[in-house]
Curated annotation (Swiss-Prot):
GO terms for molecular function: toxin activity. It comes from the Eukaryota. It comes from Crotalus atrox (Western diamondback rattlesnake). Residues 1-61 form the Disintegrin domain. The lineage of its organism: Eukaryota, Metazoa, Chordata, Craniata, Vertebrata. Inhibits fibrinogen interaction with platelets. Acts by binding to alpha-IIb/beta-3 (ITGA2B/ITGB3) on the platelet surface and inhibits aggregation induced by ADP, thrombin, platelet-activating factor and collagen. This is Disintegrin atroxatin.
Length: 61
């Protein structure tokens, strides 16, 4: 993984993240980027722009 220094188990200089649904090419995806599409009665889950995690909103559409 080019975003992760295997020797230190930390992200490489200039990288924000190494993995996650909201991580793309070592950077956090923009706020509002759909990271988990709507399913059934649930709305899309979107990235915050501040984390590599895809938060579950748990809001009905």
């Amino acid at each position: 993984n080019p975003c992760c220094d295997a020797a230190t188990c930390k992200v490489t200089p200039g990288s924000q993240c190494a993995e996650g649904l909201c991580c793309d090419q070592c950077k956090f995806m923009k706020e509002g980027t759909v990271c988990r599409p709507a399913r059934g009665d649930w709305n899309d889950d979107t990235c915050t722009g501040q984390s590599a995690d895809c938060p579950r909103k748990g809001i009905y559409g």
